[in-house]
Regions:
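Metal-dependent nuclease catalytic cores that hydrolyze phosphodiester bonds in DNA/RNA
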Residues: 1-152, 259-260
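Metal-dependent nuclease catalytic regions and adjoining charged, substrate-binding loops involved
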Residues: 9, 192-284
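Generic detection of intrinsically disordered/low-complexity segments and helix-coil linkers/edges
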Residues: 15, 39, 78, 91, ...
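Compositionally biased, intrinsically disordered low-complexity regions enriched in proline and serine
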Residues: 22-23, 46-48, 98, 167, ...
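Alpha-helix initiation/capping motif
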Residues: 41, 56, 86, 173-174, ...
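Amphipathic alpha-helical interface surfaces
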Residues: 108, 112-115, 189, 235, ...
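Mg2+/Mn2+-dependent nuclease catalytic core
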Residues: 131-236
């Protein structure tokens, strides 16, 4: 007989800081689940969790755009210099970081303002992000009933039953977005966020997840899409596998790499399509 899993009640927290949310080790997020599966592995996930990375300046533009679109996030500090080469510019930048602000050069501030304006003008994204008609960055916690793992999500914007996820990207062309969904396993995020919102009782008739991708290159074009049902099902199946892996690792204290425990050296080859192509060319 399978042992009963203790299920803690769902919880919705308003006003929780991003730092506190990401530092929580009693639950797992969508990015954590994705990191457990190939090309990641449990060993790398655990190391990264135990050794948080310092702030990455390359994320500042994305965070600033999120603030202007969602109305939530650290305050912006405009640094009136053309670049960061001057010592005074670097000093002002570092002081802004110490004050928990996002430092932006004037040109970058103008850029994110233009990006936010493009969102507001967009016929689909604009209405989705209408101020006062949604909630930004609520923290939602629930327990996976199959494994007992405590889970968490933090939707960018929740408008009724619609989860709106805003992402900046170098190129928002649909083909590029499609590859990004595959490369970053955003189909797992889609399924996980829908499950979290529904588990918390925020969408009694079912939740929807909408991606809003915006190019970081002028004129800051936007692609709004919903995931196919099949890809969402794949994402949910990947989440289920990752949850089982996580529960096992937490229970045993063993966090394996890609190979896992073996009694002999495994084989490896080229990607299958390369093997087929070269076999056809050289072995026939």
């Amino acid at each position: 007989m399978t042992a009963a899993v203790e299920v803690e009640a769902p919880q919705i927290i308003d006003g929780l800081s991003a730092e506190a949310y990401h530092a929580d080790r009693a639950s797992i997020s969508s990015s954590g689940l994705r990191a457990l599966l190939n090309p990641g592995c449990p060993a790398q996930f655990k190391y990264d969790r135990d050794h948080p990375q310092p702030h990455k300046k390359e994320f500042d533009l994305g965070h600033a755009a999120h603030l202007l679109v969602l109305g939530e996030g650290p305050e912006l500090e405009v640094i009136d210099f053309p670049d960061w080469r001057k010592k005074d510019a670097q000093i002002q930048r570092d002081e802004a970081y110490l004050a928990d602000k996002i430092p932006l050069l004037t040109k970058d501030h103008d850029m994110v303002q233009a990006m936010a304006e493009a969102i507001r003008r967009h016929p689909i994204a604009g209405p989705l992000f209408t101020p006062g008609q949604g909630l930004a960055e609520q923290s939602i916690y629930w327990t996976d009933p199959a494994t007992g793992v405590r889970c968490r999500v933090r939707p960018d914007w929740l408008r009724g039953p619609i989860v709106v996820d805003y992402k900046t990207i170098k190129d928002a062309a649909p083909d590029t977005v499609s590859r990004a969904i595959k490369d970053r396993s955003y189909h797992q995020q889609d399924a996980f966020y829908i499950d979290g919102v529904e588990a918390a009782g925020l969408a009694p008739d079912g939740a929807r997840f909408v991606f809003v991708f915006q190019s970081k290159i002028a004129p800051y074009l936007i692609t709004v899409r919903e995931l196919t049902d099949q890809d969402r099902d794949i994402g949910r199946a990947r989440n289920d596998r990752a949850l089982r892996i996580y529960a096992e690792c937490e229970s045993t204290g063993i966090w394996p790499d890609w190979t896992g425990p073996v009694t002999e050296i495994p084989q490896i080859g080229m990607p299958s399509w390369d093997t087929l192509r070269q076999a056809e060319e050289y072995l026939t």
